[in-house]
């Protein structure tokens, strides 16, 4: 009798003060796809509620939340504080695993990809950068996570 692996569904999240980039992947397939962005809510609670709706709609089992670790040890940004609180709010609101994943320079890398490789203007890059950054975060997690079988 075969033992099929149960598929896990991941949501990659690149949290920003104005927009939140989103990416999606199903494991074991393991391909991250950008799915757009949403506007950040007026409060963290409102933002969590928006994300919970997406989590439920897509039947997400694991959220990979980009965590902007500081370049220098010992520093913590206001954005990082918001992300830690958002992580707690998501875990309180729905039965989902939230993993904080190093996202340093993911937005800068996404910006370079869209500007250089795709040649998109600044106006056309708006919003796309966030979802590409979320895809980079999720791809990094899927490629490097010790939690997933190879």
From Swiss-Prot:
InterPro entries in the record: RNaseH-like_sf, YqgF, YqgF/RNaseH-like_dom, YqgF/RNaseH-like_dom_sf
SMART domains given in the database record: YqgFc (SM00732)
Enzyme class: hydrolase
One Pfam family this sequence matches: RuvX
GO cellular component entries: cytosol
Annotated compartments: Cytoplasm
Any one GO BP annotation for this protein: rRNA 5'-end processing
Gene Ontology MF term list: nuclease activity
CDD domains: YqgF
Record flagged with keyword Kinase: no
Family: Belongs to the YqgF nuclease family.
HAMAP family, A to Z: Nuclease_YqgF
UniProt protein name: Putative pre-16S rRNA nuclease
Record organism: Chlamydia abortus (strain DSM 27085 / S26/3)
């Amino acid at each position: 009798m075969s033992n099929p692996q149960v598929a896990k569904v991941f949501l990659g999240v690149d949290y920003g003060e104005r927009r939140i980039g989103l990416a999606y992947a199903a494991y074991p397939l393991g391909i991250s796809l950008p799915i757009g962005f949403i506007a950040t809510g007026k409060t963290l609670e409102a933002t969590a509620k928006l994300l919970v709706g997406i989590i439920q709609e897509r039947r997400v089992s694991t959220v990979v939340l980009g965590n902007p670790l500081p370049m220098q040890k010992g520093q913590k940004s206001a954005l990082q504080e918001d992300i830690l609180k958002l992580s707690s709010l998501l875990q309180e609101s729905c039965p989902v695993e939230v993993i904080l994943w190093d996202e340093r320079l993911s937005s800068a890398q996404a910006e370079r990809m869209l500007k250089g490789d795709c040649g998109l203007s600044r106006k056309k890059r708006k919003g796309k950068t966030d979802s590409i950054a979320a895809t980079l975060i999720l791809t990094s997690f899927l490629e490097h996570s010790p939690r997933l079988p190879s």
